[in-house]
Amino acid sequence: MISQERLLKVILAPHISEKSTVCAENDNTVVFRVAIDATKAEVKAAVAQLFEVEVDSVRTLVNKGKTKRTGARMGRRVDWKKAYVTLADGAEIDFVGAE
């Protein structure tokens, strides 16, 4: 059993991009930025509990941070994790909340 506190820390934000919009329209898939140490089971449980929807599958990937120049020094951006969450037929998540 995953604690309530942990579930609230797993999902950081929805990831909005051209690809995520196409996935949402065609495949009933929503894309989230998640904690780097989050597992697929935690992501599935968090989405199911927070948005009250049924989740079919979860696919995750880690985006490696890019090396960037800041003045004379070289810096590195932070690695971050993204999760593609496929919802069951008939389920949808409304981020806008408009009726």
Curated annotation (Swiss-Prot):
GO terms for molecular function: rRNA binding; structural constituent of ribosome. Coiled coil: none annotated. The keyword DNA damage does not apply. One of its GO terms (biological process) is translation. Keywords: Ribonucleoprotein, Ribosomal protein, RNA-binding, rRNA-binding. It comes from the Bacteria. Pfam families: Ribosomal_L23 (PF00276). GO terms for cellular component: ribonucleoprotein complex; ribosome. Belongs to the universal ribosomal protein uL23 family. One of the early assembly proteins it binds 23S rRNA. One of the proteins that surrounds the polypeptide exit tunnel on the outside of the ribosome. Forms the main docking site for trigger factor binding to the ribosome. Part of the 50S ribosomal subunit. Contacts protein L29, and trigger factor when it is bound to the ribosome. This is Large ribosomal subunit protein uL23. The gene is rplW.
